[in-house]
């Protein structure tokens, strides 16, 4: 199984679109998780071309406020989808591998860039992780550190929640 998590910072640039389509074919990707897509909806033609024509199932989380949206897709030749859950800061797919029946979770996150929302983001993530018993792949743009100058104060503010969630 191969996949990619990418903060694409918008999909309006044809070079980014072509890069992702080519990458999907070249690396034979089974999932694609994008943040900051800048899109509230996507046509079927757009999505089919984005994954290089493969048979993908997609979920679009539209932009809201400063959050610029998410897009999560899986290859239906590789996986069966059980359920899709959308939180304020995540999209979760419950997946079953077609080849061996193994069940697991694929979670794409896009954390709040504003410090005032960090607590909400980490709390939601902690609740998500605590309630699940299946193995999980969790990735995306956590926005925990936004530059070298803020590193010391931001980690101090959030490290308790973040690191307790991981343990």
Residue ranges and their predicted role:
Residues 1-167:
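A shared catalytic/ligand-binding motif for oxyanion handling
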